[in-house]
Amino acid sequence: MRLGKPVPHYQEKFPVGTRVRVKSRQYLEGFRRDWKYHHPISTEQIEAAGVTDTVKGAAFYHGGDVLYTLSATPGTWHEVCLEAAS
């Protein structure tokens, strides 16, 4: 509890160890264009479009945005930029 209020429970969509795929280049370019807040994605991340990797870690930005690190693909990844690998 903080100031008499319970701490919100955040839940990531992709737990550590989950195989994920970075979404398409078109999606990532649109995200970079439209996203105006924390952790903008880089050109290096856009080059990783379509890559499959494993979730190394998940963290929560203030307000509940889920941010991931991947095992072999650099950058901090927004949950909406990833999808389950089939």
Model regions: which residues?
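Basic/aromatic-rich interaction segments and small domains that mediate binding to polyanionic partners
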Residues: 2-86
